[in-house]
Amino acid sequence: TYLLKKYLKASVQNVKKQDVTNLIDIVLSDLEKSKFINDQFYSDSKAKSMIQRGNSINKIRSYLIGKGINNQLIKDTVNKIQDENSDQDFFSAIKLCKKKRIGPARTEDNRPLFYKKDISLLARNGFDFETSKKVMDLDKDDYLKIVRLL
C-alpha cells in the first residue's frame, strides 16, 4: 500500500495530491475487502521464504519495513518465527555457512585465516556477534550433524 501511494503520487501530474490519495485509499480498501491485498499473509510468507534461504530475523525485519508493512504485523511475524524455533538465527546462520562455504564449512586449515572475514559476512547478513561466534566456533563434526538435520 505504501509503495503504491508513493508511485502514484510521483507519476501523476496536474492533479491535486489529495485527490490522488483519496482515490488510492478507495482502491486499496476495495482490494483489501476482496482479499487481493493481505499484508499479514505477505509478511508471513515472505518471512518463511527468507528463513529457508538462510536470512536472519534482523534482515527479515528490515526487508519488511522497507516494503512498508505495518510495525505490528512485523512484530507478529517475528514472534511467530521465534515461537516455532527459539534459536532460528543460529540455524539460519548454519544454512548461510553451508551456502557460502564459510566458517565451519571451510577446511580446517583455512578456518583461522578467514575467521574475521567470515564473521563480518555473517554480520552483514544481520546476525549478531554472539550467534556468529557460536557458529564459527562449531567443530566440523557438530556442523555436519546439524546440516544433516536441516
Feature-to-residue mapping (PLM):
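An alpha-helical, amphipathic repeat domain used for nucleic-acid recognition
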Residues: 1-150
